[in-house]
């Protein structure tokens, strides 16, 4: 992958001195609202969502290499970032049409790569739901959509992070044993597709290739993969792309995510960092709603800091520099 000078400078801003991306994700919108309504009866307000993002940015970006936010509720938080932290902004609308299995991509209406760059972002992030076994017609539509965003990012000379969430059109429950059995094929297959230079993607943000809760030694119930099988899937995922790639935390606990990274490294996965969200800050939501901003800050300073500090220690032992892949 040939990086322009501007893209390289921006990727360096997003990573630490070792070329590892230890990014904090708080671009959640729908997921954040769902977390909030567990603790309050009224609809979450814009002010509440903005304030939560600001306090997390303010308290934790001094320990992260960068932060991912959304332009809908996250712009005030972009002003609270530590001066050394890079900024990614999400370009996609939250969620997808649940009346269809297509999960078509959709950009935020009043945003563009140009506007994201003007807001001070060092990268554009876009989330795509992709089923490698969907019809060619549907997947060509999705691929063309990603080509457009890639071309925008080339025009603006800004890095393009594509987040791929694999799924199966015929399996509704992504946490099921049924989906766990096909997940490696879905995740690795999608990575292969979007590693093609035609998409102009600079970094892939991906799921781990297995549901770790069904791996021997991690599983509390049914085992779908032996440790050897799971390790082989991590290795196959690494070999599926020549692009830098980082793992998303997918809402699992901080400890399970850290253990997963160690397992990935031991399996031969040369991943280049993480974009970790709920595993770091989820506890602050309840504190914020029940006891206010000061309580939420205290939660972030203690539990949130511990989570990010432990994660950083694990990353230094397990992740590799993105510069080795470009």
Curated annotation (Swiss-Prot):
Output the superkingdom of the source species.
Bacteria
Record GO biological process: 6-sulfoquinovose(1-) catabolic process; D-tagatose 6-phosphate catabolic process; lactose catabolic process via tagatose-6-phosphate
EC number, as in UniProt? 4.1.2.40
What's the top EC group for this one? lyase
What's in the keyword line of the UniProt record?
A: Lactose metabolism, Lyase
Q: Does the keyword GTP-binding apply?
A: no
One Gene Ontology term of the molecular function aspect: 6-deoxy-6-sulfofructose-1-phosphate aldolase activity
Pfam families membership: DeoC
List, alphabetically, the InterPro entries matched.
Aldolase_TIM (IPR013785), DeoC/FbaB/LacD_aldolase (IPR002915), LacD_aldolase (IPR050552), Tag_1.6-dipho_adolase (IPR005927)
Q: Which reaction does it catalyse?
A: D-tagatofuranose 1,6-bisphosphate = D-glyceraldehyde 3-phosphate + dihydroxyacetone phosphate
Q: In which pathway does it act?
A: Carbohydrate metabolism; D-tagatose 6-phosphate degradation; D-glyceraldehyde 3-phosphate and glycerone phosphate from D-tagatose 6-phosphate: step 2/2
Family assignment? Belongs to the aldolase LacD family.
PANTHER family, from UniProt? SULFOFRUCTOSEPHOSPHATE ALDOLASE
Family annotation (NCBIfam families): lacD, PRK04161.1, PRK12399.1, PRK12858.1
Report what the protein is called: Tagatose 1,6-diphosphate aldolase
Q: Which organism is it from?
A: Streptococcus pneumoniae serotype 4 (strain ATCC BAA-334 / TIGR4)
**In the record, what lineage is assigned to the organism producing the protein?**
Bacteria, Bacillati, Bacillota, Bacilli, Lactobacillales
Which gene name belongs to this protein? lacD
